[in-house]
């Protein structure tokens, strides 16, 4: 069963470093993993339309309308890391873009009903694709490499390897859908 600690230990193993039992233990490696895992995970999540992270919801109108320009405001879901598509639910509107803007954690538009397709901030690694888990572990290893090894050449090499793993994971993920 996958866990954040397992993913961190995969990163530490890549570096030849001591593994951890928990993110809160009082070791340098645990502190680094605890500090860097979530930002790395979210950066990787935002970098691609990962199939395992896509959510679709109808947004509820906010009670307060925008001050100018648009008629309606909607609050983005708490875990929304990236908006992929906004539509009004009719078949042809899914293929055409509606006029809207993202302002902070709000969507403003003139549409009275909207649906959101977005990248969700899923925290359970068991819900990640295996390639995504591996890509995150490699990105984490590259990120913490210098702090653990004090070797900039090795850190640069790991960044190259991590980027290769990320490209591979994106390719595998992108080819799972039917052709448009």
Which residue ranges define each predicted feature?
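Internal mixed-charge
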Residues: 6-7, 93-180
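Hydrophobic/aromatic-lined pockets within catalytic cores
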Residues: 12-20, 41, 45, 49, ...
